[in-house]
Amino acid sequence: MKNKDKDKSTGVLLQEQLGKKWELAWKDISDKDAVIVKEISDDYIRFLTAGKTERQCVKLSVDLAEKAGFKPLEFYQKTGKINPGDKVYMIHKDKTVVFFEVGRESIEKGMAIIGAHIDSPRLDLKPSPLYESDDMAFFKTHYYGGIKKYHWVTIPLAMHGTVVKKDGETIHISIGEA
């Protein structure tokens, strides 16, 4: 054992010997690239701030896609034609969306697919959630999407949701946002 290691615990020595030493990427990044990373990060934070639910994320994604030239599948169905390079999207139940660009080569040569999903941390109401106790009404809930039970006290409380009435009318709810 080296003289400088004699005061280190066995655990520390094992960590140094077996553990991965992570280097910060910021050490090697150029000032120009740091600005680009900051801009992308800021855009992502704005998206996360505005997209609290799947429905909000779908709407935001479609708005961005339309600015980039994407059109809904219905547009192409009406025209009856789709061409190589066309940018298409399709929304399903306002909670999922698919984007694709029609390839310029035949499908026999393959295709490139990128997949992602929307995972909005939240509390969901359970089926038949309403109950009464001690002259108060309560909802039975469960948490979803990576929410940490112990983090909620440090986050401003807000309620976002969608109610679909019997007649099909949709009401969007947002309470508690600044």
Task: Mark where each language-model region is.
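N-terminal hydrophobic/helix-forming segments and targeting peptides
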Residues: 1-178
